[in-house]
Amino acid sequence: MCPTDQTRPGEHCHARRLNTVESLFGPLALRRNYYTGRDPSGGRAPLDQSLGVVEGCTPGLARLLCRAGALEPFEDASQSLREYGAIDIEGRRIQRLIQKLGPEFGRWNQSQPAPQALPKGTVFYVEADGTGVPVRRQETLGRQGKGEDGQAKTREIKVGVVFTQAPPEEQTPFLQGRLGPAKILPRLRPDQPQPATPPPPPEQEPARPSRVAGSTRYLTSPDPAPEFGHQLRDLARQQGMALAKLVVFLGDGAAWVWELARVCFPFALLILDFFHAAEHVGLLTEILFGKDTPEAKQHREMWVHLLKNQEQGVDQVILLARQAMPQRGKVRRQAQKALAYFENNRDKMRYWEYQARGLFIGSGVVEAGCKSVVGQRLKQSGMFWNLSGAENILNIRCVLENDHFNQFWNKRFPGPEALKAAA
């Protein structure tokens, strides 16, 4: 007996109304009371709500449809379900279900409880980036783009990620052979033969920082950078940012990324992605020494090495580039423009120091999210989205990527495990 299955003031009961509910085992005929008259937007069926029926589907089927529709185009998902499980559901119905539940997934992704504690010495990372998604024409009206007609064809989806790094004692210390304690050799008697001078110990490779398993949380949003920044900050707080020893913000050279960091993470150590910086070194050497020339390649390799491995490497690169500039002309103007990238971001390019502290210097985690969370589903051939539809898909994909999909369904439909897994 459903406790809410009774008439409320102003309602009229249509007793035993028949409803067909789709399940993992096929359609089911469900007779239940249906109440109208109080809500002008529609009636209510308390038994449907009690059983977790959503868009005419049982919880077990709805869970499967959401997962399939988030991973594949809707018609492909429909075909896969038909082939793998003999489940005959149209692609449009999968789309409607995702439109219904997508906002719930989004709220769930931003409301996970913070950990009780973080291990001592934990470093907390925040990364942000953006990627364009093809959208319908009405979504780009009045927006300028990079095409010949000046009309935008895409809308930017902001992608953020937070994660923690394993404590230093769980990682190999950086350059331990050079910076660690000296080894004390035993003293020899005068009558003992003196050993040959041993070769210097091989220089240890820089320690590779590693993420704590299960700590990565993705967030996506079509909102402007200021709103997205507050969403990302809230997610970081929920995941224990305030408990970390150090907060690091990693990003590329986009102006909105650093403005977001300045406003929402003013206490963080800012690091510009090394691989973006290396690309700009390549552009600079092409300007100064010619495209695809041996001299340009040689200088690029040398300057990238300086930038990454030498203390004050960015200052050395700037100095060498200025020495290589001609006194006047077009090449000088282009080189000065390219060099401004390094001068403006000098304080975020102390890569030797970052590596000595065992920190990440690349924003590969968020760039991987741009491809795996957004690109693989929303940027396939022939796709054009409205923003709400894209956002609903991404909400589910973030929950999947964060490994919270089962938790979402357990929270939405609490009850015995056998009942949750039922049709």
Language-model-detected regions and their locations in the chain:
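Basic, low-complexity segments
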Residues: 1-56
